[in-house]
Amino acid sequence: MDKVDTRYDIGTETILHEGNELIDISAIAAAHAPWWNRTLCAVNDTWVRLGVMEGDFHWHKHDDQDEFFFVLEGRLDIELEDRTVVLEPGKAFVVPRGVMHFPHARGRTVALMVEQAGVVPTGD
């Protein structure tokens, strides 16, 4: 179950597309406000999510799940406790489970995220 946080428009429990459907990521991403996050589809035991982000998220971690980020447009800085990872279009990064991280989108950023089904995007 997603945590309720009014700063972010996050609704990952509903899967928007089933298998054997065309997914128009550009059209979906164009229609939403900053820090919008939805599950596009399920692939086996994982969710593929689309995030439209701008500005700061918050420090958080996922105790039992790794988190994969792939930037499609914009720039996403992921601050870790010991460094900052800069993701621009075509770049990807895996935040290992249990690692504190602070995503910051420098301007409007669109990214795909892949995580275990049932993830709470706001952290544990």
Predicted regions and their residues:
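Short strand-coil-strand connectors
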Residues: N44, E79-R83, R106
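A short, N-terminal "cap"/entry segment at the start of jelly-roll beta-barrel domains
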Residues: M1-R49
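A cytosolic small-molecule/anion-sensing beta-strand core signal
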Residues: N44, L72-E73, E88-P89, G107
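Ligand-binding loop in jelly-roll beta-barrel domains
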Residues: R97-D124
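Short acidic-glycine-tyrosine-enriched beta hairpin
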Residues: E81-R97
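Conserved short histidine dyad/triad with adjacent acidic residue
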Residues: A33-P34, W47-D63
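Short, conserved beta-strand element in jelly-roll/cupin
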Residues: V52-E54, H62-E79, V114
